[in-house]
A protein has these predicted regions:
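A beta-strand/beta-hairpin structural motif
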Residues: 68-89
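Short acidic/polar inter-strand loop motif in beta-rich domains
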Residues: 100-114
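Extracellular beta-sheet/turn segments enriched in Thr/Pro/Gly and aliphatic residues
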Residues: 20-21, 36, 76-80, 120-138
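A short, amphipathic beta-strand motif
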Residues: 31-39
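Sec-dependent signal peptide recognition
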Residues: 1-7
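C-terminal motif of bacterial Sec signal peptides marking the signal peptidase cleavage site
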Residues: 10-13
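Beta-strand signatures of extracellular beta-sandwich domains
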Residues: 51-57, 98-102
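Bacterial signal peptide processing site
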Residues: 15-18
Length: 138
């Protein structure tokens, strides 16, 4: 009887996805690249513990779609942000987005005086994106 129930379960659970499910939209939810330093800021990396915080947001909404936090990374830092890093799984990483990289002694979301930042626009699904940290928050 158990074998029969397992067989019935497998038959009904292995149905094809509906044709209107946009698999490519979900498959391409990534951005891959490097975070680099402008030469003028290389000496300003904090001593001791610090965090690299990379955020992805669309061009209309200030709330990030995805965030990656890394403690004391080596530079140039190679990153890949995928849909697994999304803050809200109802939002989709797609189209043109703004990537921001920030070096901070705090792992918090708020920008603080002394943080080092850089940003660039990128297309979701792109590899080879470069974010250059070139600004100090005053």
């Amino acid at each position: 009887m158990i074998k029969f129930l397992i067989l019935i379960f497998l038959i009904f659970s292995c149905q094809p996805l509906p044709k209107d499910v946009p698999l490519e939209k979900y498959r391409n939810q990534f951005i891959e690249g490097q975070v680099l330093f402008d030469d003028s800021l290389k000496g300003k990396v904090p001593k001791g513990d610090y965090f690299l915080i990379i955020s992805v947001r669309d061009l209309e909404n200030p709330m990030p779609i995805a965030v990656l936090r890394v403690k004391k990374p080596k530079f140039p830092y190679h990153f890949k942000i995928t849909g697994r890093r999304k803050l809200n799984h109802d939002r989709i990483m797609e189209g043109q987005v703004l990537l921001t990289a920030r070096i901070s002694v705090s792992d918090k979301a708020e920008i603080q005086k002394g943080d080092l930042m850089g940003s660039t626009n990128a297309l979701v699904g792109t590899r080879g994106v470069k974010i250059i940290i070139n600004t100090e928050v005053k």
